[in-house]
Regions:
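Extended low-complexity, intrinsically disordered regulatory tracts
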Residues: 1-208
């Protein structure tokens, strides 16, 4: 498939690995692997809602913290995790840009935020009840340590806009186990108990 200028257009690929099936350090009583200093730092930032100052978290972790804070403040109508906990949606772009972004990011325009999502490999869903939401297989509700595996992509050569993705290839999140918040106590040492709360499989659109 070519662009209007005759350049080859890259098609969005939706290969998805269920990272929730991978035991995350510090979330189960059966996993005795000690936390690294980096992992401890991530959990500290996540638990204390550290978003600014020295040692500010990278974009994926900051987004995890943002979603947690916004939920605690009762502003899920602006931005939130979707019911399955595997993607998030921006429901009110105007309010997100003017009331949320300035608190968490240096950028002031939603287009800049979307560019960051693209640079970190987030993919936009193009169909179904979650149309317009973003996901990354290592970006899951209550699993901040997985964000360590989200790497910023280096763009080389000609920049071409990806073609629309094929709906039939997009992950079927509502057919996967729903992910609830995980209690990650400050100072957990790898012997923390998994307190994930089961989620009701309510098939509802966060964009309705």
């Amino acid at each position: 498939m070519l662009t209007a200028k005759g350049n080859k257009r890259q098609v969005v690929k939706h290969s998805y690995t269920d990272m929730a099936q991978k035991e995350e350090i510090g979330t189960t009583s059966t996993n005795k692997t000690p936390l690294t200093q980096r992992e401890k730092a991530v959990l500290k930032m996540y638990n204390t809602h550290q978003i600014k100052g020295d040692g500010a978290p990278p974009f994926p972790l900051k987004l995890q913290i943002l979603l947690k804070i916004v939920h605690n403040e009762g502003h899920d109508d602006i931005i939130s995790w979707l019911p399955h906990g595997r993607a998030f949606g921006i429901h009110k772009p105007g309010l997100f840009e003017h009331e949320i972004m300035k608190r968490f990011f240096k950028q002031s325009q939603i287009a800049s935020f979307q560019r960051q999502l693209n640079l970190y490999g987030f993919i936009r869903l193009s169909s179904g009840s979650d149309k317009g939401a973003y996901y990354h297989e290592s970006f899951l509700r209550g699993r901040p340590l997985l964000s360590l595996g989200i790497i910023r992509i280096r763009i080389k050569g000609n920049k071409t806009r990806p073609a629309p993705s094929l709906p039939e290839e997009e992950p079927q999140f509502y057919k996967m186990p729903f992910l609830g918040p995980v209690d990650l106590s400050p100072g957990c040492d790898g012997e923390n108990h998994d307190t994930m709360r089961p989620q009701q499989e309510v098939r509802m659109s966060a964009f309705s």
